[in-house]
Design a protein with these regions (language model features):
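Glycine-rich phosphate/ribose-binding loops and adjacent secondary-structure elements
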Residues: 329-331, 431-439, 443-445, 451-457, ...
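Structural motif
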Residues: 237, 407, 424-426, 445, ...
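Conserved alpha/beta-domain cores
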Residues: 92, 516, 526-877
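Protease-associated
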Residues: 357-440, 503-509, 520, 524-527, ...
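Short beta->alpha connector loops at strand-helix junctions that form conserved
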Residues: 40, 447-449, 468-471, 559, ...
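C-terminal domain-closing interface element
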Residues: 333-335, 490-538, 544
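Nucleotide/phosphate-binding sheet-loop regions of phosphoryl- and nucleotidyl-transfer enzymes
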Residues: 1-388, 421-424, 431-436, 442, ...
């Protein structure tokens, strides 16, 4: 019989695929002899089976769960629902990859009216017993039965108002007993049946809820953002309760072995006395710093710091730990490699190498490339910052600078950002439902919560700026306003805040580009040492090219020449060319553009200092260049000596029903060879001039013909380019080599790659944006209308325009490389779609033997690191 359930004593850290991260680490801590409450893990395979069985737990799995409850009862001497010594458990999710705040927890399971009375009498602490029960009813109702938390919070607030108290901890045992009754009445009203009293029924409901939560909307969003496959499933951990809410000698906390915001080697964390675990993470009360624990319970603090050292030495990484103190007894509830900011990740990795704990390869492998993005984001301008006076200071939860218009809900943040507004999200506290709004905002500011609250952890993970626990804010969410430092702020008012200092400012403060710190350079140098894949950039302007070079780009993989036509007066000349009747007229118009285009290419060659520059010839259809405004149409008519009506007729004739597959790319060069001739002359003249000024540079222009689908098509355009280039070189008496290649963006080109190479192609560059469009038959501009439905229906797990489709598009790439290199082994191949900066796509590019990836300038460090990680992972296999 298959094993679906494991005691903590039966697992270890290597079993995370089966036991999930939390279960594997609880087993590992148990093996290390640390104080971990007894428990067992229901495997990720059981979750997958639950979905295969139509969202039911089959008898075999159910039987094993009950067997393990009996084993726990034997080990602990406690029994589920017992009148003498009742067993209470927590039920927590635990996927193999950490998903903070994405999945739901239930504490105090096993309670009912009778058990509460037993606990109350045994402990002599009725307040604690009733506090546990009201928490359990609230959590179970929310997580298992999906009765909103807010209904229960409202009842608590009413009770506190009635009793004229501010904190939950000031409620008496009698108050909490009344609350439990009110909660059960609320449950019955919403669900239509009594709250369950049988602990086994409660457990079954809780396990199903954890399995269900694997497929809730926020978990799906997090998985898509973090490349976590749906098929992994989540494990469920059932663990004997340790109670942090038994009074002032009990508590609960979260701690990191190093600072997750800065990387400093110093224990950082928070705890709350007389509280349960969720109180700290949910950020409902603002907790105390971990150092205070040494004053309150020195022995517990010493034991805890020793455990921290043990865990960091064991895992050789910064640990994020949850603990509970029950009447001065310490229990470890979780450890995992801690989420951290990009800045902290770099410092921790470098420090661990310097401390002799890990190798350079390990340091490179432990950094999430996507998080580097936040290091390249703006910071506040120092001068502007000095001139500004903070109106308040709170906890610096996630670094960076945020400035924008205030919004109060995640929905508004998303909607305003979609309109192009820069917004900051101001909340009492955030919850997992806010995740998309948090992504859309420039930064997050919360009234409650500490450094380990949901807002702080999620913001750090996504590289967003966050300031938390600003209790000086008087919030009025219903009317979308708050008061701070005597001023009332409404939706749309502008504020700024600094996630590195915790300072909050009225109005806008200017931002500047981030300065790359020393550790960044070290990690990048190590990455460059281990990677084999080159990294180029997509750049059309000298400033983009220079920025990319600063960030480590080794050339330009895609220069889109059409962007150059829109600058200054040259659009007028290009429009004249489009509206010309004869080849001669077109050539005259293009002659005006040639020196301007040549100047553009010279600047790019200079910025790249002899590194490769791939120039793609004109790609978009001509209708994208024609005027739409009446004044511009009149100007063009005057220039061409035609009537406005004639120009409008030409514009109308350029309209296409399906422009993506219409008169564009190499088809323009076939119908208007003079465009290709002009662009070739500009490329070659620029190269000759720059090479003359810098003979030490190895300057070999790469001319890329777009949208080729047939070898004869390529041969036709190549002939035009070659004749023009050779003529220019001869005329200048220069010595210049150049290459002519093509973009592979039509499936037919991939399938006939050998024929295209035989026709003279010297390099391939995969334009995966169009290749994905044409392989899937999706329009990139319109797919947003249906992709969400595809995610919900489990047809797709990721946006194929963001993450390369390995099975379809990837196979076409492999076919093209294999067939192309069979004819010309030295054929060099790259990728220049958006996928060039996506880490998982970069990994695939390494695996199939591409020579380079090309991405936008700010994604160059991400691609460099991802390429190194792919090489290191490949070597390990």
């Amino acid at each position: 019989m298959k094993k679906w359930v494991y005691l903590f004593t039966e697992g270890n850290a290597d079993m995370r695929n089966l036991l999930g991260g939390k279960g594997a680490n609880l087993a590992e801590m148990t093996n290390l002899g640390l104080p971990v409450p007894q428990g067992f893990t229901i495997t990720t395979e059981a979750c997958t089976q639950y979905y295969e069985d139509g969202k039911t737990i089959n008898d075999e799995i159910m039987g094993q769960i009950m067997d393990h409850i009996e084993k726990m009862e034997e080990i602990t001497g406690k029994k589920f629902g017992d009148k003498e010594n009742p067993l209470l458990v927590s039920v927590r999710s635990g996927a193999r990859a950490s998903m903070p705040g994405m999945m739901d927890t239930i504490l105090n399971l096993g309670l009912n009216e009778e058990v509460v009375e037993v606990l109350s009498a045994k402990s002599g602490n009725p307040r604690w017993a009733w506090d546990c029960y009201r928490r359990f009813i609230q959590m179970y109702s929310d997580v298992v039965m999906e009765v909103g938390k807010k209904y229960f919070e409202e009842l608590i607030d009413e009770m506190k108002k009635e009793k004229e108290i501010e904190q939950d901890v000031d409620l008496t045992a009698e108050d909490l007993k009344r609350l439990a009754e009110q909660f059960k009445a609320e449950y019955k009203e919403k669900i239509g049946e009594d709250f369950p009293v049988d602990p086994k029924e409660q457990l079954l409901g809780a396990v199903k809820a954890v399995f269900r939560s694997w497929d809730n909307p926020r978990a799906n969003v997090y998985r898509r953002d973090n490349d976590i496959p749906y098929s992994w499933g989540t494990a469920v951990n059932v663990q004997m309760m340790a109670f942090g809410n038994m009074g002032e000698t009990s508590g609960t906390g979260v701690a990191f072995t190093r600072n997750p915001a800065t990387g400093e080697k110093k224990l950082m964390g928070e705890f709350l006395l007389n509280a349960q675990g969720e109180d700290v993470v949910a950020g409902v009360r603002t907790p105390q710093p971990i150092a205070k624990l040494e004053e309150i319970m020195p022995e517990v603090f010493k034991q805890f710091t020793d455990i921290c050292d043990t865990l960091e030495d064991h895992y050789r990484d910064m640990q994020d730990m949850e603990f509970t103190i029950e009447d001065k007894h310490l229990y470890m509830l979780q450890t995992r490699n801690g989420k951290r900011t990009a800045k902290a990740a770099l410092k921790i990795a470098c420090d661990l190498v310097d401390e002799g704990m890990i190798t350079e390869e390990k340091a490179v492998s432990m950094i999430d490339p996507r998080n580097l993005d936040s290091l390249l984001h703006p910071q506040f301008d120092e001068k502007a910052l000095k001139a500004a006076t903070p109106i308040a200071k709170a906890l610096a939860a996630a670094p960076g600078a945020a400035c924008g218009k205030v919004v109060f809900t995640a929905e508004d943040a998303k909607a305003w950002a979609a309109r192009g507004e820069k917004v900051v999200l101001v909340r009492l506290e955030t919850s997992p439902e806010d995740i998309e709004g948090m992504k859309a905002a420039q930064g997050i500011l919360t009234v409650r919560g500490g450094m380990t609250s949901h807002a702080a952890v999620v913001a750090r993970g996504m590289g967003a700026c966050c300031v938390s626990g600003c209790s000086a804010i008087i919030m009025d969410e219903a009317n979308k306003r708050f008061t701070l430092a005597g001023k009332e702020y409404h939706e749309g008012d502008v504020i700024s805040f600094d996630g590195t200092t915790g300072n909050i400012y009225d109005g806008e403060i200017r931002t500047v580009d981030a300065v790359i710190a020393g550790e960044f350079g070290r990690i990048m140098a190590w990455a460059d040492k281990y990677r084999s894949l080159r990294v180029r950039t997509n750049a059309d302007t000298p400033s983009d090219a220079r920025k990319a070079r600063e960030l480590g780009a080794e050339g330009i993989g895609l220069c889109r020449t059409e962007h150059m036509f829109f600058e200054g007066d040259r659009i007028d000349a290009f429009r004249e060319m489009i509206c010309s009747d004869t080849t001669k007229e077109r050539e005259e118009a293009l002659e005006k553009i040639l020196p301007l285009q040549q100047g553009d290419f010279e600047k790019l060659y200079e910025a790249m200092e002899g590194n490769p520059v791939t120039i793609r010839f004109l790609d978009p259809p001509l209708h994208e260049f024609v005027p739409t405004e009446e004044a511009d149409i009149k100007k063009l008519a005057d220039a061409k000596g035609k009537s406005v009506e004639e120009i409008k007729a030409i514009i109308d004739s350029l309209h296409e029903f399906n422009p993506m597959m219409g008169h564009r790319g190499c088809r323009l060069a076939v119908t208007y060879p003079e465009i290709a001739r002009m662009q070739t002359a500009a490329v070659i003249r620029a190269a000759i001039k720059v090479k003359g000024e810098h003979p030490e540079w190895k300057l070999v222009p790469e001319i890329m013909i777009p949208l080729i689908g047939d070898n004869k098509e390529f041969a036709f355009v190549r002939k035009i380019v070659k004749e023009t280039a050779d003529e220019e070189i001869k005329k200048a008496g220069a010595d210049l080599s150049y290459e002519i290649g093509t973009m592979i963006e039509i499936p037919r080109a991939a399938l006939t790659a050998d024929e295209i190479v035989k026709a003279g192609a010297e390099f391939f560059c995969f334009g995966t944006n169009d290749l994905t469009q044409m392989t899937y038959g999706f329009s990139r501009d319109d797919s947003g209308k249906f992709l969400e439905a595809y995610y919900n229906a489990k047809i797709l797990e990721n946006d194929p325009f963001a993450k390369l489709d390995r099975n379809g598009v990837g196979q076409l790439m492999e076919v093209a490389i294999e067939r192309g290199k069979k004819v010309k082994p030295e054929l060099h191949c790259g990728i220049c779609g958006e996928h060039g900066g996506d880490p998982s796509s970069v990994e695939f590019c390494h695996q199939i033997g591409l020579d380079y990836v090309s991405c936008s300038p700010f994604r160059v460090p991400i691609a460099r690191l991802a390429a190194a990680q792919a090489a290191i992972a490949g070597k390990a296999k």
